[in-house]
Every structure is written in structure tokens, then in C-alpha cells.
Design a protein with these regions (language model features):
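Glycine-rich phosphate-binding loops that contact phosphosugars or nucleotide phosphates
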Residues: 39-158
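Cofactor-/ligand-binding subdomain signature composed of acidic, glycine-rich
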Residues: 1-29
Length: 158
């Protein structure tokens, strides 16, 4: 298939974003950010829906052979197992996903957990600013699936 044929099918030129994934990954992995102290973390809970939730699924697979218990929540509530040794990673590319916003509210009420949010903005960014929750604003590319490497490598960088 040549580019002309591809562009007739891929009218939004998603292939250009996918072609740039290695550069996007490198940019976010090498970005200077505040690191999280993991020495006392024995559980990580990822929360996100759709394409945002897939990032948590990937981390669950990556960490499956470690001693860290990993949960991926695609719903509204923080698991009761969360405690002071838990890192909660909330991911919403849009920043407006209802389930993830409610999960964030639930996690914020559980003050023992270490909490960090990754979003491109929206209501979630505003909530984090208002409640003084640590968050990283990540660029959104075209769609959640196109934004996958920017979110994945931003989280790997903490």
C-alpha cells in the first residue's frame, strides 16, 4: 500500500502519530519530573476507563512477576485494601470521564494512600489543583489510543 492509498483510508492521518510513537515515548520517558519514593509501596492501584485503563492493564502485566500487588479499577471506588503503602495512579486522558472522576474523589478521601493523577486536562486537572493533588498534565494526541505512549512513558518516568 502506498501513502496515497493509506491517506484515502486514514483520512485523519493517524498513521503519522503511530509512526511518531518512538519519539513520543522517548520525550516523555526522558522528561525531568519529580520521582516517587517506592521503597514502602507494596500495592499499586491503577484507575482508568477505555484507552486510559489499558495503560493500567499494561503495568499490571509488567509488574505481575514482582512482589507488588497490582489492581486495575475500571469503576467508581477505591478498593478497601488500599492503605499507607498503596500508590494510586489515576489516568484519564480526557480528564472528564465520570467513573474516573468519582474514583479520584473516593481515593482523595482515603488520605493514607499516595495519589498521583495523569491527565490531559478537563475537570480532573481542576479537581487536582483545587485539592492540591499531585498530577502530571500530559499531551493528548488525536484520541486515547493515539495518546498511549505519552501516558505509558510518563508513568514509567515516575
Amino acid at each position: 500500500m502506498n501513502i496515497k492509498n493509506l491517506e484515502q483510508i486514514d483520512t485523519e492521518k493517524m498513521y503519522k502519530i503511530y509512526d511518531d510513537w518512538p519519539n513520543i515515548a522517548r520525550t516523555y520517558f526522558e522528561k525531568e519530573t519529580k520521582k516517587i519514593e517506592f521503597s514502602r509501596i507494596n500495592q499499586i492501584i491503577f484507575a482508568g476507563m477505555g484507552g486510559s485503563g489499558v495503560v493500567g492493564d499494561v503495568f499490571s502485566a509488567i509488574l505481575s512477576k514482582t512482589n507488588i500487588h497490582v489492581s486495575v479499577v475500571k469503576g467508581y471506588h477505591l478498593p478497601k485494601t488500599a492503605d499507607s503503602n498503596t500508590l494510586v495512579v489515576v489516568i484519564s486522558i480526557s480528564g472528564n470521564t465520570d467513573e474516573t472522576l468519582r474514583f479520584l474523589e473516593s481515593a482523595n478521601e482515603h488520605h493514607d494512600c499516595k495519589l498521583i493523577v495523569f491527565t490531559a486536562g478537563g475537570k480532573m486537572e481542576q479537581f487536582c489543583i483545587n485539592k492540591k493533588i499531585e498530577f502530571r498534565k500530559i499531551e493528548k494526541y488525536h484520541s486515547p489510543r493515539a495518546s498511549f505512549p505519552s501516558f505509558l512513558y510518563s508513568i514509567l518516568n515516575i
